[in-house]
């Protein structure tokens, strides 16, 4: 299936409009994930025109790459510290809630529904339904539209390994996973930033083995 099949049966002009708009959306999402919040759009567009229209650059491409990479590195450091502080603040606040249990690793969970089935082992495959949230309540992953999924526990992030091997089949938990048990300093672009604490609502349907 080519790009035109994916976009639908529309004329060529509309295809290019959609592709161009979508390219802008995808690129903006990537920049926002890196921490860009106050781009000067005129300069940004000038930079793009320089490449596409082959005009004389105000700054050489090589120098532009260096400037961009250095700035991204500084942004990631700032984002990493900000996310770490926000995660610690949430976990600290959760300690005041008697319904939330904290494990030695720092992972926290609240039992929403207590199942009465088996508890899986690390080597098991399990069928789960879940929603994953960033700390601003934005959903970054969900089975809501695709239905229950089957995973091998040993291949999942550390936080999921730990919590799934404590849940009974039929259980539904709200889980708070600190960054060191999730995606750590690297994050998982484009949605999950470095040192992000994640919140999941996980329902363990059954052990598939």
How would you name each of these model-derived features?
Residues 1-209:
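Cross-family detector of peptidyl-prolyl cis-trans isomerase
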